[in-house]
Amino acid sequence: MAALPGAVPRMMRPGPGQNYPRTGFPLEVSTPLGQGRVNQLGGVFINGRPLPNHIRHKIVEMAHHGIRPCVISRQLRVSHGCVSKILCRYQETGSIRPGAIGGSKPRQVATPDVEKKIEEYKRENPGMFSWEIRDRLLKDGHCDRSTVPSVSSISRVLRIKFGKKEDDEEGDKKEEDGEKKAKHSIDGILGDKGNRLDEGSDVESEPDLPLKRKQRRSRTTFTAEQLEELEKAFERTHYPDIYTREELAQRTKLTEARVQVWFSNRRARWRKQAGANQLAAFNHLLPGGFPPTGMPTLPPYQLPDSTYPTTTISQDGGSTVHRPQPLPPSTMHQGGLAAAAAAADTSSAYGARHSFSSYSDSFMNPGAPSNHMNPVSNGLSPQVMSILSNPSAVPPQPQADFSISPLHGGLDSASSISASCSQRADSIKPGDSLPTSQSYCPPTYSTTGYSVDPVAGYQYSQYGQTAVDYLAKNVSLSTQRRMKLGEHSAVLGLLPVETGQAY
């Protein structure tokens, strides 16, 4: 193998202190420069290319001398998966040849001589399965492993010659899976040495080395009664002591080791379910409503060109929770706001059912100063504009659930407008009585301070003469508006219940 620049190629070279017999196999692989890759053990390999045959021989030879696959992997610097696959294939088939990469295996068709033997075996023993006929062909030397027909081919021959399929094919496959390992034992494979010459292989013959194979235990199948007993014990404790495990083993007729393994697997499944439940509970805390009381939310979002202060929620316990400032809707949301104006009757009915005040459908005075770039005056519903245009028609309330403080700097806090959940539904004067020089910033986008009290009421502070100028300069679009749009819309009664969300 062309070594990596500046390094001596040492791929798969066993260490000097090993006690297994050594052979003359060269353990250095030559590859074209630039194609070699180094695995986690320091060995060089080419991705997608089979391991060389002399290294495959060495793996089988070391396994024959009792060296564990993990040690073989470290000594030869071959990945553990590669070693295990080569040994498993050798134990099952007696061959160290690599399998086909991609595509399907060529279909093995029985020759006329082999078909005659199949018919002869079937007449001698009518209850013989297809896989047994296949093994008999190998044992008697009529075929080798490269020319022996497949089980499906033998079944096809039997179906054609005898007019019916030899038993159920699915039963044949299950029997084949269950008995193939026993029939294809290492002794049986190695007993057929003469038929193991591989013409297409780089080596003259397959290695003649029997390997010790530890049989794998079959999976334990629990009955409903056993599972019921185990689940009851798991409800009492997740870590039973030795006495509890032995008692369970006697009641369920299982071994104590099986009970211990069941509890280990059950604890792993319980931890997985607990993690999924915690994730589902966390998803409910995402934006879309008020968070639980006393739970801090995201830190204040710093806007580059905005002078809005941070909104705070003051609670009775004295703890202050900082919330990001709500912002105007985006262009997509403005279309939804216009649609909300068309659903004014539904919104008014919603407010009446929930004891909100019903507002008139009048907009602000058309002579009032407006800005075509201002999304507030262009996209708000009539209810919001009617509240802002005629504050005197709404009587004040001394105790409010959410009190919205006025903007800082030049705003009149003496006069205030308030909307109470308990006040009657009465019409508000049209907006033409408002002087043209006076306008108010909607409380939806104002700097708000919420005080949570048990009384259900909403009090809105009136803004002064400079609110329009302040609004024209400072209202901007931001993604934070989407986070708080739901709760502010619910306060203003913009969300019809029957027709779904207006945004």
UniProtKB/Swiss-Prot annotation:
Region described as RED subdomain: 113-161
Record-listed N6-acetyllysine modification sites: 105, 139
Keywords noted in UniProt: Acetylation, Developmental protein, DNA-binding, Homeobox, Myogenesis, Nucleus, Paired box, Transcription, Transcription regulation
Main location as per UniProt: nucleus
Top-level taxon of the source organism: Eukaryota
Keyword Transcription regulation: yes
UniProt-annotated stretches for the region PAI subdomain: 37-93
Compartments it resides in: Nucleus
SUPFAM superfamilies linked to this entry: Homeodomain-like
Keyword Nucleus: yes
DNA-binding region, residue range(s): 34-161, 215-274
Motif (OAR): 477-489
Bias (Basic and acidic residues) ranges: 165-186
Annotated stretches, region: Sufficient to mediate interaction with PAXBP1: 27-208
GO MF annotations in UniProt: DNA-binding transcription factor activity; DNA-binding transcription factor activity, RNA polymerase II-specific; sequence-specific DNA binding; sequence-specific double-stranded DNA binding
Function in brief: Transcription factor that is involved in the regulation of muscle stem cells proliferation, playing a role in myogenesis and muscle regeneration.
Quaternary structure annotation from Swiss-Prot or TrEMBL: Can bind to DNA as a heterodimer with PAX3. Interacts with DAXX. Interacts with PAXBP1; the interaction links PAX7 to a WDR5-containing histone methyltransferase complex.
Family the entry assigns: Belongs to the paired homeobox family.
The protein's name in its UniProt record: Paired box protein Pax-7
Species of provenance: Mus musculus
Lineage: Eukaryota, Metazoa, Chordata, Craniata, Vertebrata
